[in-house]
């Protein structure tokens, strides 16, 4: 399995607090059968904004531990979308996913659909492929025809493993089930934040999706597509 969205990098957002915790999170990932991870620290104006130099320094410190466990580790960003998004990526202020053409975009719960659509289109025109993070959280996307419209534009749709499993609540489980049934999920990721709360549940989720929606689909959204993202295909 490959996890393209997690907060395993320590000391840069609301995820891992220390190198030790990050190493524990890597061990949990290994037990889940994860072979590749894209670290996606938050970048959000006025809330999470750490110098790239610090992010890259912590990444380098973590690398030997990942190598030892046989996990490929790449850098990315979970970018909370603002109007200067293209400048931020073009200007190298944050990492695309594994330094490919893919970017992980996040919105506010109350974002207007017109804004989500506009910024997704802007990213695509600029040469990026937006992966829209945890779509189940946005009120404006409760109508799944809007998910189809975003996919037609060229975006990929990501949901969280914990939402699929019902850990994040029944509402999210119902919504993600509807998306999975319609074949509208492109990627499932852990969005894990620690070792005690919001832990990685990718293995359990893979088994659930395979049982309910078929092995082929589980493989596509938790192995094949994430692998294409990490390799920039």
PLM regions and their residue ranges:
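Mid-to-C-terminal alpha-helical segments outside catalytic/metal-binding sites
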Residues: 202, 206-233
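Metallo-beta-lactamase
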Residues: 7-16, 145-151, 159-162
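Short acidic/histidine-rich active-site segments
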Residues: 184-199
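Non-catalytic positions within long, well-ordered alpha-helices that form the structural scaffold/packing
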Residues: 30, 124, 180-181
């Amino acid at each position: 399995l490959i996890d393209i969205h997690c907060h395993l990098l320590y000391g840069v957002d609301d995820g891992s607090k220390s190198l030790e915790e990050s190493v524990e999170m890597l061990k949990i990932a290994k037990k889940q059968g994860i072979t590749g991870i894209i670290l996606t620290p938050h970048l959000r104006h006025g809330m999470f904004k750490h110098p790239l130099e610090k992010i890259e320094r912590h990444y380098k410190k973590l690398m030997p531990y990942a190598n030892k466990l046989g996990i490929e580790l790449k850098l990315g960003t979970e970018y909370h979308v603002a109007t200067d998004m293209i400048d931020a990526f073009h200007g190298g202020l944050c990492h695309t996913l594994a330094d490919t053409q893919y970017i992980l975009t996040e919105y506010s719960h109350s974002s207007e659909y017109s804004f989500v659509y506009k910024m997704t289109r802007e990213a695509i025109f600029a040469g990026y492929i937006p992966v829209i993070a945890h779509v189940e959280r946005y009120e404006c996307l409760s109508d799944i025809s809007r998910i189809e419209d975003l996919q037609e534009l060229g975006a990929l749709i990501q949901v969280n493993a914990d939402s699929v499993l019902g850990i994040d609540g029944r509402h999210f489980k119902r919504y993600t089930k509807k998306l999975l049934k319609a074949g509208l999920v492109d990627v499932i990721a852990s969005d894990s934040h620690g070792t005690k709360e919001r832990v990685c549940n990718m293995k359990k989720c893979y088994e659930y999706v395979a049982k309910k929606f078929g092995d082929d689909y589980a493989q596509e959204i938790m192995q094949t597509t994430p692998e294409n993202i990490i390799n920039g295909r």
